[in-house]
Structure formats: structure tokens, C-alpha cells
């Protein structure tokens, strides 16, 4: 909000008619997505959650094409999504992937994925006549406040360590990264079809594995044959959706 206010040279405050848009985005992009995600993550494996989360790209394109009718669902988009999903499955090949379905685990991760997909489509619709930075900033502020209240009512508490400065700095750093990422994401959705942008979400698990190799010393796991195959599949999916999915 502060950055947007500086860029616009005026306070970035939503108008009364824009409040429902902020509330709708806050509900889907922050409250429901993270509420279902963290509860689900606590009740399922990281492998399964990665695969289900990867389906958000496919869900995004389906909702954009079939529900909101913002673009056409072409065979190239379907092929690209299938390749991207295959890449996520390959990079997460593990026995735990085949374990039983859990409603509060796998089910909640799936609901989180649907909430995220709906929020992406809403950003596309709302950004036609509303500032994207304003939407991102205020929906995060509202959603964060609601999530804080829910956490406190559910028995959570705020406890600071003996040296709180590193923890506070890390919290602000993560908040800054999230705000920047979602603001850029919103701008991209404003000027491009949902499918062309959403398909890059397939890179999330691949980047996670590669960054783990560079930053956490997990090179042996990251540079497996499965990781390289996944990178090829995901890259092919992105290329097909962007180069063949729409006539320029």
C-alpha cells in the first residue's frame, strides 16, 4: 500500500464501490487459501500437497474458460497443463503419493487450490477498472487481520523470543516478498490471458527443488533424473500454452 501510494503520489485507498472486490479477493486469495492450506498440510504429506497444489494451474484455466468465459479452452492449453502436472508428479515420485485420501488433509489442500484459482480469475476481472496494487495491498491487510483474529480465537498466541529482532525482520522480509510477488502476479494477469500466466505456476515445485540444492545443500536429491525430466515436462507445458494456446 505504501509503495503504491508513493508511485501514484496519493494515498492508495479503495473507494466504497471497490470494497466488495477487496473483500472477495481477501476471502479467496488469503483467508480460504491459507486456512485450508495450512490445516491440510498438517494432515497430509508434503509430496501429496505439492502434487495437488500443482493442479491449481489446471483449475485456474478451467475456471477462467468454462465458468467465467474469459478465454477459450484449447487442446494446446489442455496438453500444456497435462505436461506440467506430469512434471510435478515425476518430481514428487514417492510411495506416500499413493497413500489414502484424507478429507482434512488432501481435501483441504484441494479446496485451497480451488480458492487460489478463483482468486486469480477474480484479479483478472477486477483489474479491468481497479488498481491492482490497491487490490493486492488491501486484500492482504484485511485477510491478515481476519487470519490473526481466527488464530487468536482458536487458541494461538504471539510469543517473542529473547532476541526478537531477527524474527521481526524475517517476518517483514517474508511479508515484503509475498506482497511484491502477488502485486507483480496481479499486474501480469491484468495484461495477459489467465492461461499464459497461470501455467508458470508449474515452475514452483521445480524451483523449490533447485533452490534447495543451492541453498540447503540438497544437490544429490535435486539433480536426480526425475528432477531433470520434471523440468523438461514443465518447460514443454509452458511453451505449448504460451506459443500455441492462443493465436497472437
Per-segment meaning from a language model:
Residues 1-32, 55-63, 115-119, 136-155, ...:
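Transmembrane alpha-helices of multi-pass small-molecule transport proteins
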Residues 5-53, 86-90, 174-192:
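Specific transmembrane alpha-helical segments of multi-pass solute transporters/efflux pumps
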Residues 14-20, 93-115, 152-172, 221-231:
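Juxtamembrane helix-entry segments on the extracytoplasmic side of multipass membrane proteins
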Residues 17-24, 72-85, 106, 130-139:
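Cytoplasmic-side transmembrane-helix entry/capping segments in multi-pass membrane proteins
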Residues 27, 38-39, 99-128, 133, ...:
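Glycine-/small-residue-enriched transmembrane alpha-helix faces in small-molecule transporters
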Residues 30, 34, 49-55, 123-145, ...:
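Helix-helix packing/entry segments at the starts of transmembrane helices
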Residues 50-53, 69-90, 99-105, 217-237:
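Loop-to-transmembrane alpha-helix entry segments
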Residues 167, 202-248:
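C-terminal-most transmembrane helix of multi-pass membrane proteins
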Amino acid at each position: 500500500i505504501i509503495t503504491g501510494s508513493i508511485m501514484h503520489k496519493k494515498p492508495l485507498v479503495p473507494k466504497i464501490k471497490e470494497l466488495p472486490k477487496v473483500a472477495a479477493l481477501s476471502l479467496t486469495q488469503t483467508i480460504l487459501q491459507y486456512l485450508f492450506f495450512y490445516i491440510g498440510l498438517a494432515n497430509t504429506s508434503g509430496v501429496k500437497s505439492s502434487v495437488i497444489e500443482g493442479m491449481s494451474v489446471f483449475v485456474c484455466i478451467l475456471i477462467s474458460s468454462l465458468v467465467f468465459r474469459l478465454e477459450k479452452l484449447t487442446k494446446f492449453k489442455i496438453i500444456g497443463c497435462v505436461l506440467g502436472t506430469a512434471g510435478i508428479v515425476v518430481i514428487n515420485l514417492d510411495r506416500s503419493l499413493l497413500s489414502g485420501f484424507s478429507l482434512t488433509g488432501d481435501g483441504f489442500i484441494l479446496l485451497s487450490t480451488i480458492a487460489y484459482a478463483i482468486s486469480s480469475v477474480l484479479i483478472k476481472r477486477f483489474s479491468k477498472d481497479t488498481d491492482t496494487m490497491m487490490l493486492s495491498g488491501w486484500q492482504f491487510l484485511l485477510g491478515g487481520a481476519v487470519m490473526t483474529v481466527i488464530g487468536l480465537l482458536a487458541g494461538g498466541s504471539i510469543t517473542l523470543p529473547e532476541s526478537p529482532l531477527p524474527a521481526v525482520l524475517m517476518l517483514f522480509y517474508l511479508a515484503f516478498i509475498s506482497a511484491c510477488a502477488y502485486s507483480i502476479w496481479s499486474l501480469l494477469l491484468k495484461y495477459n490471458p489467465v492461461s499464459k500466466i497461470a501455467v508458470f505456476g508449474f515452475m514452483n515445485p521445480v524451483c523449490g527443488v533447485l533452490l534447495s540444492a543451492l541453498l540447503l545443500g540438497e544437490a544429490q536429491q535435486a539433480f536426480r533424473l526425475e528432477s531433470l525430466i520434471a523440468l523438461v515436462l514443465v518447460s514443454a507445458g509452458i511453451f505449448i500454452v504460451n506459443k500455441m494456446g492462443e493465436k497472437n
